[in-house]
Design a protein with these regions (language model features):
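Beta-loop-alpha module in the N-terminal Rossmann-like domain of NAD(P)-dependent dehydrogenases
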Residues: 31, 53-117
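A general structural signal for well-ordered alpha-helical segments in protein cores
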Residues: 17, 113, 139, 168-169, ...
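Rossmann-like dinucleotide-binding domain that binds NAD(P)(H)
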Residues: 151-213, 255-262
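C-terminal helix-rich "cap/oligomerization" subdomain common to oxidoreductases
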Residues: 2, 52, 56, 60, ...
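Conserved acidic residues
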Residues: 36, 72-73, 150
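N-terminal Rossmann-like dinucleotide-binding module
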Residues: 1-54
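C-terminal active-site/capping subdomain that shapes the small-molecule cofactor and substrate pocket
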Residues: 7, 210-275
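A contiguous active-site-proximal alpha/beta segment in oxidoreductase catalytic domains
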Residues: 101, 106-163
């Protein structure tokens, strides 16, 4: 019997929920899973209501969050533009013991991230969260890590750094680790550079502006690489997510996810002039 994937969302008619079903149906483990129940807390202004959305995407509208959790084998908590609601929307799922994927950004603060993992561990619930940019072909092939880079630079765009900065921080932490001792930010909401200094002296830098593509440059004593694009990010993310759903083992250490949430919290505080 195929495992059922359930969706929980703030409002269901959004880009991730609209595209994940197609990628689930094309993924390497597609024959082991099927899309099941979906629920939204509210309908987005101008968006499709749940029943209409489900009809178009081949899912079943649920009457409550509880119904999704009870009738699913694995659960996606979406709301990719609203990390402030993730802890609330994921609460029942994190008590279920079933694999739960929480969309990016995982949490609005490091403390919230810690609480979510603590709740998941209390109920023995496997938990995973990631930006798709961790899973670009160019980062998965191992060449960047093989350089043992002393400096790692990313660029990226999107509507705002608050929402899209997660992508660059995910790439940085996945390649460079979590031991960041200092952080500086220059710029404003339209353009900025964020510099991370690691405890061992390594450096990482993220540059943001609306139209910048997602790129990576890395260098160390073994050489240098310039990667002008990140390819197949979402397809690779979905493949890893489905393996997680099948095994109950997250491919990402929780320490990285918590660190990324903390770094995003700190960097946006610097951006907006908060201490």
């Amino acid at each position: 019997m195929k495992k059922k994937i359930g969706f929980i969302d703030l409002f269901i008619d959004e880009w991730h929920a609209n595209n994940y079903p197609k990628w689930f149906r094309e993924a390497p483990l597609k024959n082991e899973f099927e899309l099941g129940y979906a629920w939204e807390e509210k309908t987005n202004e101008g968006g499709k209501p749940l029943a209409q959305w489900c009809e178009g995407l081949g899912m079943t509208p649920a009457s409550s969050m509880k119904e999704v959790v009870e009738k699913s084998d694995c659960i996606c908590v979406l709301a990719p533009a609203n990390p402030e609601v993730h802890e609330r929307l994921a609460d029942l799922a994190l008590r279920s013991g079933k694999p739960v994927y929480v969309d990016k950004p995982f949490a609005p603060s490091g403390k919230a991230a810690e609480r979510m993992f603590a709740l998941a561990e209390q109920y023995k619930t496997p938990l995973m969260s990631s930006s798709a940019l961790r899973y670009g072909d160019e980062l998965l092939d191992g060449k960047v890590k093989a350089l043992e880079p002393s400096i790692f630079c990313t660029t990226g765009g999107g509507r705002s750094f608050d929402e899209y900065g997660i992508h660059q921080l995910e790439m940085i932490v996945s390649m460079m680790g979590t031991d960041v001792k200092d952080m500086t930010l220059k710029g404003d909401e339209k353009k900025l550079t964020l510099t991370l200094e690691y405890a061992d002296g390594r450096l990482a830098q993220a540059s943001y502006s609306l139209y910048l593509p997602f790129t990576v440059s890395a260098a160390g004593e073994k050489g240098a690489l310039v990667l002008p694009a990140m390819n197949n990010t979402f397809q690779n993310l979905i493949a890893h997510m489905m393996t997680f759903f099948a095994t109950g083992v997250s491919p990402i250490p929780k320490e990285e996810t918590i660190a990324i949430a903390s770094l995003l919290e700190r960097s946006t505080a610097l951006l907006h002039g908060k201490k």
